[in-house]
């Protein structure tokens, strides 16, 4: 008879193994479906891949997208793929196309891979996995990083561009010829509370700027300690920040650039113009 303590340890071990297997299965981001070459071409064009880019393909399969980025645009690239046989196939393809010095293929979980180096991210994953990546993209990727998602949007994030096309050869692969590409530019992280400084001619007192930033919306208000004044039509694209403000009857237009915990730029109003600065305090 197996002692109770040993049986309990064995049961715990089996449970842990089963849990690990379940977690690994949960992170298999869909079956391998090769992207037709015409779509590879359009994804690279939409991302405006350049020689100074580092292109990450999450779920890279046979590596064709990363290899094409290196061969056609001299970009560097990283492919992340869970299946070892596909990783080896991609490495062989890189050697054959003479770009092995510019690309690397990593066997690993794309949900745990460090992606901070990327300036371009490509993905062709099932919707539930795409949505899991949205918080990571917004939190970890540098402002200005471009993302192209094949067929599935990064909900609830709104794309900067969309491209639709009919690709007959895709029907034999995935059952449909209709293709959609979604293009995103990672915005600077501007949410929080800021000390806002304006020219004295526009605001004589210190102001507080409070910004709320979500994947599908950004906005906020300015407070002088007594009254709140809401921002108008705020947009954040890469590091570029724009918004309007009606402050005590004076309509002002702000343009600027975010850099970490500081922002600065120009402000215009009928009564004058000048520069503005902001420093994040929390």
Where does each model-flagged region fall?
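S-adenosyl-L-methionine
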Residues: 19-53, 84-117
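Conserved SAM-binding motif I beta-strand of class I
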Residues: 76-81
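Active-site capping/gating segments
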Residues: 153-195
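Central antiparallel beta-sheet cores of small beta-barrel/beta-sandwich binding domains
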Residues: 188-282
């Amino acid at each position: 008879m197996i002692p109770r303590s040993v049986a309990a340890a064995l049961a715990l071990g089996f449970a842990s193994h089963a849990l690990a297997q379940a977690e690994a299965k949960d992170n298999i981001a869909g079956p391998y479906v090769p992207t037709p070459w015409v779509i590879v071409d359009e994804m690279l064009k939409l991302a405006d891949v350049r020689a100074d880019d580092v292109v990450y393909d999450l779920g890279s399969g046979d590596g064709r997208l990363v290899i094409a980025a290196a061969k056609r645009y001299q970009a560097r690239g990283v492919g992340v793929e869970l299946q070892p046989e596909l990783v080896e196939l991609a490495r062989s393809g890189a050697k054959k196309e003479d770009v092995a010095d510019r690309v690397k293929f990593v066997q690993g979980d794309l949900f745990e891979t460090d992606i901070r180096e990327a300036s371009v991210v490509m993905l062709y994953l099932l919707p539930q996995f795409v949505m899991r990546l949205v918080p990571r993209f917004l939190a970890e990727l540098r402002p200005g990083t471009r993302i192209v998602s094949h067929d599935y949007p990064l909900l609830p994030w709104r794309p900067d561009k969309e491209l639709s096309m009919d690709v007959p050869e895709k029907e034999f692969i995935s059952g449909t010829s209709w293709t959609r590409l979604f293009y995103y530019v990672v915005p600077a992280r501007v949410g929080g509370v800021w000390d806002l400084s304006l020219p004295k001619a526009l605001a004589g007192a210190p102001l507080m700027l409070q910004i709320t930033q979500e994947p599908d919306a950004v906005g906020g208000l300015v407070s002088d300690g007594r009254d709140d004044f809401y921002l108008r039509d705020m947009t954040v694209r890469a590091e570029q920040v724009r918004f309007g403000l009606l402050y005590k009857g004076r309509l002002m237009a702000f343009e600027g650039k975010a850099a970490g915990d500081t922002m600065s730029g120009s402000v215009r109003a009928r009564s004058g113009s000048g520069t503005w600065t902001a420093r994040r305090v929390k």
